[in-house]
């Protein structure tokens, strides 16, 4: 019965608001007004007049023009107060009939929470000292036909926050600040790389081969060409082609799509930055990564110390670096530096409670040890390098031990934030790696890499030694804004379809 009464109450509110809209029209006013030129945002009013006393403002009248959404409203008779909200925040307005006129005051009296209004008036301080605007002219700009969410606490239903982000932004200041920070973080990354001489480029999102990562793609069909295409799962292979072509320092910030599960860390479409630098290696990229992230934190937050949940994270340059085999040995006592067979590695996995598949080779098993035993312990920024060649089909082998590659992953607060390596530029080795991946796919690994003959042909023209990097932008923003879920940093995350 409660749900029925709530629906009836909502329907009553919708009806009342539409009746008010009709009244506005009948009085010759437009309930969905036109252009309105402001002189100030609410924050600009507060900053500009912060130092002026009540007496100073009364002596020297300061006119401003502001506009925003009514968030609170009180008063009776011939005067009333309201708080309106704009991009900068909220500010109080004071509306009197003898200042704005009877017709405009009636519009103010009939206005509902959520309506959008414009004010021309003078800045003053109330008896309690609150900086406010006394209206000399009141303009009705937009009638809200639906009531806002709960008045003081914003949206209480987390899923509704994600589905109707506009309501979340309307009522949740923290959410709005998160997305403003997101924009600033991406801009800071761009500025850093542009100043370092990197060229921003754009490459296709529709690929003929799903390559560049171990992931399941979204598949679509091009009608005119009658061919299957894949939404890109990585940006990598096209950027490497540009390195072959002579663009020596390139990056792209763009959407990537993976047809996989949804969690607090994963969304089917997400934003990545990938960059490549000719004549560099993974050590150079490691230094670039920590300098870039430390710079972005300082630029956007004003500090390199950030709070994430219960953890205080130090992003200042000087991050820990550890080989994957050493990390496994330190945590479990298992020494994968020693040569061993697949069967011996599987026996060690069973002994230590590490789940592996029959198709896993020694390199896969080393990685499973790391993911199941060590990853959850890495809170402070840590570069884990030296990944096995079996799980790194696009990375260059380490010249001192070809079982491993010159690759690293960055872990902060128990999750991967970046993946990088000295790029494999030997086309013969690359073909062999792709062939090994095809064998894995035939054995049941549906995330194994496809053969990409066009990319191999590009390598045959000669790619200089190159370092490459991929950073998950959304996870970085989660870290820098202390957001527990990836959905908190995506304006419109992917949600299960519901029938209304």
From Swiss-Prot:
GO molecular function: ATP binding; catalytic activity, acting on a protein; lysine-tRNA ligase activity; magnesium ion binding; transferase activity; tRNA binding
Record-linked Gene3D superfamilies: Bira Bifunctional Protein, Domain 2, Nucleic acid-binding proteins
Disulfide bonds: none
Chief location of this protein within or outside the cell: cytoplasm
Single GO BP term: lysyl-tRNA aminoacylation
Keyword Flavoprotein: no
Annotated binding of Mg(2+) 2, by residue: 416
Compartments, record wording: Cytoplasm
UniProt KW keywords: Aminoacyl-tRNA synthetase, ATP-binding, Cytoplasm, Ligase, Magnesium, Metal-binding, Nucleotide-binding, Protein biosynthesis
CDD domains found in the cross-reference section: LysRS_core, LysRS_N
Record note on quaternary structure: Homodimer.
Protein name: Lysine--tRNA ligase
Gene of this entry: lysS
């Amino acid at each position: 019965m409660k749900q029925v009464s709530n629906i009836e109450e909502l329907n009553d509110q919708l009806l009342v608001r539409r009746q008010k809209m009709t009244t506005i029209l009948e009085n010759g006013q437009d309930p969905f007004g036109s252009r309105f030129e402001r002189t100030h945002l609410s924050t600009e009013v507060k900053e500009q007049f912060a130092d002026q006393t009540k007496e100073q403002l009364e002596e020297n009248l300061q006119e401003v023009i502001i506009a925003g959404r009514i968030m609170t409203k009180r008063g009776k008779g011939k005067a009333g107060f309201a708080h309106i909200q704009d991009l900068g925040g909220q500010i109080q307005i004071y509306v009197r009939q003898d200042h704005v006129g009877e017709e405009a005051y009636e519009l103010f009296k009939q206005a509902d929470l959520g309506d959008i209004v414009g004010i021309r008036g003078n800045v003053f301080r109330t008896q309690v000292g609150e900086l406010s605007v006394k209206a000399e002219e009141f303009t009705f700009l937009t009638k809200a036909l639906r009531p806002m969410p709960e008045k003081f606490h914003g949206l209480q239903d987390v899923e509704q926050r994600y589905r109707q982000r506009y309501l979340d932004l309307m009522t949740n200041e923290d959410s709005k600040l998160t997305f403003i920070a997101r924009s600033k973080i991406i801009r800071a990354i761009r500025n850093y790389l542009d100043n370092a001489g990197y060229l921003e480029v754009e490459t296709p999102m529709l690929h003929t081969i799903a390559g560049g990562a171990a992931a399941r793609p979204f598949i679509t069909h091009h009608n005119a060409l009658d061919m299957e295409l894949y939404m890109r799962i990585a940006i990598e292979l096209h950027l490497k082609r540009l390195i072959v072509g002579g663009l020596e320092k390139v990056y792209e910030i763009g959407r990537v799509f993976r047809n996989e599960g949804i969690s607090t860390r994963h969304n089917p479409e997400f934003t990545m930055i990938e960059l490549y630098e000719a004549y560099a290696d993974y050590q150079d990229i490691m230094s670039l990564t920590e300098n870039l992230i430390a710079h972005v934190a300082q630029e956007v937050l004003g500090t390199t110390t950030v709070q994430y949940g219960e953890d205080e994270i130090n992003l200042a340059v000087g991050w820990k670096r550890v080989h994957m085999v050493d990390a496994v040995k330190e945590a479990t006592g298992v020494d994968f530096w020693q040569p061993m067979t697949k069967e011996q590695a599987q026996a060690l996995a069973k002994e230590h409670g590490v789940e592996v598949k029959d198709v896993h080779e020694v390199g896969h098993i080393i990685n499973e040890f790391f993911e199941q035993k060590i990853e959850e312990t890495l809170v402070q920024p840590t570069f884990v390098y030296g990944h096995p060649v079996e799980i790194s089909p696009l990375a260059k082998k380490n010249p001192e031990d070809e079982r491993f590659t010159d690759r690293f992953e960055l872990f902060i607060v128990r999750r991967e934030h970046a993946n990088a390596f000295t790029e494999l530029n030997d086309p013969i080795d690359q073909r062999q790696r792709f062939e090994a991946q095809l064998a894995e796919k035939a054995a049941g690994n549906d995330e194994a890499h496809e053969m990409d003959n066009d990319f191999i042909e590009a390598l045959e023209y000669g790619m200089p030694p190159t370092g490459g990097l991929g950073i998950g932008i959304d996870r970085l923003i989660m870290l820098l804004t202390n957001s527990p879920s990836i959905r908190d940093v995506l304006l419109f995350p992917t949600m299960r379809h519901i029938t209304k």
